[in-house]
Each structure stands twice: as structure tokens, then as C-alpha cells.
Amino acid sequence: MAKRTDIKKIMVIGSGPIVIGQAAEFDYAGTQACLALKEEGYQVVLVNSNPATIMTDKEVADKVYIEPLTLAFVSRILRKERPDALLPTLGGQTGLNMAMELSKAGILQELGVELLGTTLSAIDQAEDRDLFKQLMKELGEPIPESEIVTTVEAAIGFANAIGYPVIVRPAFTLGGTGGGICSNEEVLRDIVENGLKLSPVTQCLIERSIAGFKEIEYEVMRDAADNALVVCSMENFDPVGIHTGDSIVFAPTQTLSDVENQLLRDASLRIIRALKIEGGCNVQLALDPNSFSYYVIEVNPRVSRSSALASKATGYPIAKIAAKIAVGLRLDDMLNPVTGTTYAMFEPALDYVVAKLPRFPFDKFERGERRLGTQMKATGEVMAIGRRIEECLLKACRSLEIGVHHNELKGLDTISDHELVAHIVRAQDDRLFYLSEALRRGYSIEELAGLTKIDLFFLDKLRHIVELEQDLIKKPVDIDLLIEAKRYGFSDQKIAELWQTDAASIRRLRRAYRVLPVYKMVDTCAAEFDSQTPYFYSTYEWENESIKSEKESVIVLGSGPIRIGQGVEFDYATVHSVKAIQAAGYEAIIMNSNPETVSTDFSISDKLYFEPLTFEEVMNVIELEQPKGVILQFGGQTAINLAEQLTKAGVPILGTQLEDLDCAEDRELFEKALKELGIPQPPGKTATNEAEALEAARAIGFPVLVRPSYVLGGRAMEIVENENDLRSYMKTAVKASPEHPVLIDSYILGKECEVDAISDGQSVLIPGIMEHIERAGVHSGDSMAVYPPQHLSKQVQDKIVDYTKRLAIGLNCIGMMNIQFVIQNEQVYVIEVNPRASRTVPFLSKVTNIPMAQVATKLILGQTLKDLGYQDGLYPESSLVHIKAPVFSFAKLAKVDSLLGPEMKSTGEVMGSDLTLEKALYKAFEASYLHMPEYGTIVFTIADDHKSEALILARRFSAIGYQIMATEGTAAFFADQGLDSQLVGKIGDNAHDIPALLRKGQIQAIINTVGTKRVTDKDGQMIRSSAIEQGVPLFTALDTAVAMLRVLESRTFSIEAI
């Protein structure tokens, strides 16, 4: 069947901001799909609200709209563009839900827009719990006994009938939002009440819990001619009961017999055929370990997180093929782009094992609820490839970047057996490390299998790692054993610890005996056919398949797993840097460990090494490739942290050099440089212990801002008001980086702004100045940023430009640099300088039309700004107003306080652009799911420091028709000032406290601030978490509330009596 000629223009819906459960995998899928459709000659219109993505680059689609993904905006774009068809299956749950909304509102029918890939009935059958149940019955596929409920009472009735535990799954939600396992009525009542609110159709499925079964996934493809195949099978290390996004996953499946594999494979193919999906689909099944009985858990009728993993694990480009199937091409028409000779109808065969480990945000949120269940909590993931399970598991552990280089966590050897077992029984994000510790203490794998229901096969692999550790201790400097340990994935560092030496000596020993890794190709066909892909992984075997090319090469280090503080923005910069390296005539080589991203798509670079970003692994690749140099600027803190070791090893670092990186990161050197350059900064000192810290704070005067040096995303940063708080900070937080001292600065409450600059060493281009809406003290990644600035005087802007130039030249910056300023009484202070690409690069590149990472790379490779046609200084401003707004994932993270402060908490971002500030703000709020109606009730619960400021806000809210409610102290203050408000009980005042009113839907927004003391007030935290659970807009910074007020005021007419 040929591709369709009756459609010319296709609209693709992106997945919006990155939240837990929906991360960079959709940027990868969307980019692949848009390029595939363009390749086939279609006109592509893309809509997405997330500027930090490659898919929203102008080259990816014919027309790109960065607008809110709401019914109002998407239907306007549809009316304007009049596409023939809509492809919603590449935008995750957001894309599917948008297609459903457009269809239900009658817009698709009115405009004659056809849905491609998955029909509405298939989306309904897979997503609507009732229809799914019916379809499975018709197919004779077993599913756990279940009932759809729309009330809490019905849920309790059904649970009593089948017995606890039961699982709750709300319909049409993402990443298991609102779901959970309930072992009694009390828990069930809470979860269902919340789940019904979160489900857009007010439905929950209550089903028998099959926790403890093996969880298996199949990634399947089908075309319009009913050809179907399995691209990849995957097995979760953790049994059913833990969300697959939070599970350790191996591909292909490891513990299934041939019969079991065929059974589940056939079921998956039957399901995709019954749903008539044209494209990709993910089927999750539960297998009873003791019999051949299985259950179908769920079906995702779209490209998903697992498809990104399956694509990278096999090399088979699922999203690209799915997009082509959607326009009528068949699997047996399309060549497999990996081999270039076999067809896409060919099922991939793997001669290696892949491990995926989730990356959790609990290094940032130490107080968060770490227990795992059916609701996803990981922000990102890493993947590692090896010939053996032990090898890929240990490589994946090193890739996580949580300070471990082995399946071993510092400090676990000192905990009691009781505590150890408690951690193993209750699955947490770090259970793998507790299991490994138990095996080191001599627990048997049978005991652990009994406690966890994890298959003995996997536990035996962990035991084998422990046995190798013991052998290494017994036989120091045994070369045969060294080879054995390397084959099973041990790092030089771990072997060095066991042999009581250092990693450098192990490296020398390995090289002396020629114990070196070889690189194998990922080729989809287990080396049966010749392959064209330059996609490699390391292993300790004989034949090396990665041949150094004749061309001079440059290696770019990626940024590893997505976590809070280091998101998809850095991947964006990496991909752009590669484009510039290729344009300059070099071979571009990427090293990265994240399966979700565009940078690890093998068609992006000339060579891709899927490896942990550690010194050992990076050096191995450098020794093989002998590149011109390595670029670290675009890999976030991950890459910058390797600068020192690489420089010492004699590796040429391209761009800003180590001593200049140090000058920006090392406190004393930085102060000295600023003095020499005549640039003011807030008074500050360094301290290495509690006594020094107290002395420093007394000299500077409270409040002070304290933080460790060399960190990203404001990790462990706090505003401290008094000596007691400082003592407790020094006790708990300084473990963040022991070799580096703690920085103590005077905290200046002023306006914050930031600049990204690009320098060639002689002249400096400043694409734009971004002004933050929230005042200093809120992390820049959590602030709304406005470009061009709206409230900075010409004099202040000139000063910012002058200081930026002085810093870039003074610190010998070649490439990118990010500087943050605070402004108080027209005085400009520098708060920090990062000599690398920052998270604002994609946003600024989009709004100024300067491909910043590409320009920076060209300068790093020796060109000048003048060569590229750019002037020195500030680039002319755009005529539109653009806003970058943060998006948070608090709804997924129980017990994490949503109060904004100097530690970053947002997971993603959106952009709003329009002719006026108010319109741009409106779009940014809509895109970040902060919708406020034009009237309603708003609650004020305000700290003493902010009451007079809040009074002005309350009066303005009242003037546009909002009813004002306030807690006791705030209401009393308002009354004294002549403003009436309705008193509301804080917590525990039964039917009239804030959580109760929130549950009844009687509150439309809450403004809750905490004084500079930032005392952890239990009440405030409960109010904040209730607002998040109920999806009610919550403002913890008055400046954000003022911004929202501007929007509401601009939308309402004033009514005054004459």
C-alpha cells in the first residue's frame, strides 16, 4: 500500500512541559516523527508549549507553534492552519487527551480533520477502563477482576466483595497519577476520593491486586495491512505493584521460558490487532511465576516511555516508523534505517542485554515519600548495554550520578539487620542497594525472594557480584581475576578499593596487560547482516567493531539522566553543538547514558557511545578515538565535574579552560577576579566547619544565603535567619560536597535577572537579558522569566551589559556563560557565574532566533563572532513579550513541600509569547496548568513580613469580583486596614478548614507565604499539599500572584457606580 496522497498537511501535538511520568522521551518521539513526515513530503504543523525541546525548533516542522496545549488555543491553530489530519500519538497522554477533547467538542468534525495512527475508538478502548475490560473479555484475554466506580461507596462495596489488597487506577491520567495499592478501607477511601477528582471522566478502576506477579512489557507495531511485529520484550526486575517507570527493567526478557514468551507475545499481537492501532503500542502483562496464567495489565495506544527505551535498546526507530505507518506506508515497504538492507518488518534480535535504572529526585527532596507504588516518582532514567546482566547493571549504577560507582551505597554497612530487612520489604527508590548489602551480609537469595517476590535469577546475579568482590579481596593483583571483574562490569575505582590502591594504578595495570574494552555495535540483527549504524557500547571481549575514522573528531559529553536542576535543556544544547561540529567539517561523537533523549538517537551524531559519563569510561573512548578535543560546556554539571581529571590526564578541553572554570566555581578566586574587574557582589565568606560559619555570618549580618560550592540546581541552598538555623544547616547539609567549603553570602532582597552570553575571548554577544518575576531568593529555575525585561532602567541594563563583557573577557570565556544578577536601588550585584550553557539556552535561542549553542560551538572551534556576522554587545530586542514559566510535579511527590526557595523544585517549563506582558503571562499560566477563573474565592494566609504587601493584592482581587477569605492573623490585619474578609479555619476546624473547602471545590486559589524565618509550619504545609492534591492554583511567592492578578485585571472590565 503506498503512502497517502489525499492528505497534504498534518498537525502533530507535542507533550507539553516535562513532568514526572512524561519526560524527554516525547521530544525524541516528536522530533523523529516530524522529520519522518517531512521526509515523505508532507507539510507538518507542530504545536507544543515546551520551548526546551528540539521538536520546537524551526527546522523540525514547517510551522511551529509554541502555545498552550488547551482546547481554546489548539482549536484556534486548527482553524488557522486547516490541516487535513492530526497525529496525536506522539505527544504522550497530553496529546491523546487533547485529541479526545477536540473530538468531543466537535472541532475535528467541523473542520474535517482526520485522526491518524490511532482511532478515537481505540484510544477510548485502551484508556476507558470499562471499554478496555469489555474488549479483553471479547478477545478472551484474562484481566484481574475489577469494577469501574464513580463514587467512594461503590469502591468500598466492591473491595469488600473481592477482598483486600486492591489497586486503584483513575481513568485518563498519566504516570499512574492518583492511583495506589490499598490494604484497608481507610486508605481506599482517601485514594478513591482523590482519584475521582483527578480523572477527567470521574472514573476509577478498582481491581484485585496481583502485586508479586512478574511484570512483562511488549513493544509492538502494526500497519494498515495488519502486519504486526514485536520490536522488543522487556522484563521488570521489580514485580507488579511498582510503576514500570520506577522499576529496574531488562531487555530482552530474561526469566521467561519459550512457552511463556510465545504466550505473552501472541496476546500482545492479538491486542494491537483488535484495537486496529496503526503505529506503535505498548502492552503490559502480569505473569504468575508459578503457573502459565497471566493477566493483561494495561495498553498504551501510543508511543510511550517504554518505546523510547525499546528504540534505544534495539536500534529500531519506533516513532519514525509509527509516523510513516500513520500515513499509509507498510512495514514490508520500509527499509530498516539501521541496516539499510533489511525491511522494517524484521523483528530485532539482540546479542546483548540492556538495563534501565530510574533516576529519582530524592537527593533534592530528602523529606519526600520514597516508598514506591503504582504512581510514578522518577524524573528520568539511564540505560546501559552489556553482554551480561551484572555488567549492564553496574554500568547503569555508575550512570545514575548519585555518587555511587557500584551497586553499593555509602553508610549501609552500619545499619541494623532489622532496618535492612524493613527497607527490603517496603520497596523504596534505593532498594537495589539494600538487597546488595543483604547479600554481602550472607542472606540467602531464597530469603530475599520470599521478602520481595523478585525472581531468583536476578538475585543470583546480585549474589555473583558479591562473590566476585570477595574473590578480589582474597587475591589482590591477580590479572585473571581483574579480567573477570571487568567482564562483569566492575569499575577501576571499585577494584582499587578492594585492592586498597587507587583507580589510577588499576588503570595503569590494565593498560600494561592490555586489559582494554572493545566497542560493539547496536545493529538490530545480532550481527547477522552488515549494519550502517555508528552506535556502540563497551564490553571486555576480543573484537572491536568501532573503527577510528580518518576525519578529525570532536567528542561532546551529554548530560546524563534527567533530574531536577538538569533537564532536557542541556540535551537541546548538546544536539545543537553536534550540528555545528559537523558543519565545521569534523566528525561529531556523542557520549551519553540517557535513553529518552534526542542526543542518543544514533542518526544525530556521526558516532554515539552509550556509556556512563565517568572518568574511566570517557577516557576509554578518548584513547580509542584520539579526538581533537572534548567539549564539556553543554553537559551541565555532569560534564563540568570531569574537567579537572580530564585536564590532568592531558585531554584537550575545547572552550573555557580548567583554571577559568575553577575561577568561576572557587569562591576565593572568584572574589579576587571580581575585585580586579571592579564588579560588586553581595558580601560573602567561606567556611569549612560550624565555628567558621557562625563567625562569617556574624560578620556579614543575618539573613544569609548558604550553599555548598560546585552544585547545580541550588542543591542544599538555604536562606538562614539566625544562629540556630545555621548550626542545623551545617550539621545536615554540608555533606553535599565535603572537599569544597560552604559559601555564606549576605542575602539581598531585590530584583533578580540573568544573562546568557557567548564569547570568543575578544568580543561578547549578549542575546538577551531575562528579568525574573519572583524576587531574589527563589531559584532562577523556579522563577518566571520575562524577555525583553519590562522593569529595568536603561542605566541598569547598561551596567548589566558592561559587567557581562568584563566577566566574559576577564574569565577568558570561550563559548557560553550564564550570569545571575540581583538589583537593589538601581545597584547591580553579581550573584553567580556559570561558565557553561545554562537551562535558559533553548528559551533564549527560540525568542531571539540566535542558535546559541551552535554559535558557541563555532567559537569553541576557532571562529570569531565577527566571522559569524554578530556584533559585540546586547542583541536588538524582539517586539513580542516572551515568558518562560516553571512547571512542577508536586502532585506526584507526597511529602515534598511546594514552598519556593533557593533550592530548585520544578521539573519542566513552558513558554507564553504575545504582544503585551499580560497576554504573554496569561498564555504562560494556561500552558503551565495554572488556570484561574474570572471570579471566585481566594484565600490569603500570609506571614507577618508580607501582610502590608498582601493587603494591596487583596484589595485588587476584591475589586475584580473575588471574594476574600483569610486565616485568623491575616483576616485581623485586613480588618484593621478596613478590608472585610471571611474568616477561614486553618487546619482541624472540621467542615470549615481550608482542606475541607478545597475538597468541596469552594476555593479557586490560595496565596500562602512563609516569613523569612521559613519555619516548617505543619499547618502551612498541609494547606499547600491540599491545594496541590485538588489542583487549585497555589502561590507561595507574592510576585507570581501579582503577575496572575495583572492577567485577571486585563481580562475583566471595571464596574464603578457614578
Curated annotation (Swiss-Prot):
Binding site for Mn(2+) 2: E298, N300
Residues that bind Mn(2+) 4: E832, N834
Catalytic activity annotation: hydrogencarbonate + L-glutamine + 2 ATP + H2O = carbamoyl phosphate + L-glutamate + 2 ADP + phosphate + 2 H(+)
Binding site for Mg(2+) 3: Q820, E832
Chain ranges of the ATP-grasp domain: 133-327, 671-861
Annotated ranges, domain MGS-like: 930-1058
Any one annotated GO CC term: cytoplasm
Alphabetical list of SUPFAM superfamilies matching this protein: Carbamoyl phosphate synthetase, large subunit connection domain (SSF48108), Glutathione synthetase ATP-binding domain-like (SSF56059), Methylglyoxal synthase-like (SSF52335), PreATP-grasp domain (SSF52440)
Gene3D superfamilies listed in its UniProt record: 3.40.50.20, ATP-grasp fold, A domain, ATP-grasp fold, B domain, Carbamoyl-phosphate synthetase, large subunit oligomerisation domain, Methylglyoxal synthase-like domain
Region (Allosteric domain): 930-1058
Biological processes, Gene Ontology terms: 'de novo' UMP biosynthetic process; glutamine metabolic process; L-arginine biosynthetic process
Binding site for Mg(2+) 2: E298, N300
Region (Carboxyphosphate synthetic domain): 1-401
Cofactor notes: Binds 4 Mg(2+) or Mn(2+) ions per subunit.
TM regions (residue ranges): none
Region (Carbamoyl phosphate synthetic domain): 547-929
Binding site for Mg(2+) 1: Q284, E298
Listed cofactors: Mg(2+); Mn(2+)
Start and end residues of each stretch annotated as Oligomerization domain: 402-546
Domain-related comment: The large subunit is composed of 2 ATP-grasp domains that are involved in binding the 2 ATP molecules needed for carbamoyl phosphate synthesis. The N-terminal ATP-grasp domain (referred to as the carboxyphosphate synthetic component) catalyzes the ATP-dependent phosphorylation of hydrogencarbonate to carboxyphosphate and the subsequent nucleophilic attack by ammonia to form a carbamate intermediate.
Family, as annotated: Belongs to the CarB family.
Function description: Large subunit of the glutamine-dependent carbamoyl phosphate synthetase (CPSase). CPSase catalyzes the formation of carbamoyl phosphate from the ammonia moiety of glutamine, carbonate, and phosphate donated by ATP, constituting the first step of 2 biosynthetic pathways, one leading to arginine and/or urea and the other to pyrimidine nucleotides.
Name this polypeptide is given: Carbamoyl phosphate synthase large chain
Native source species: Streptococcus equi subsp. equi (strain 4047)
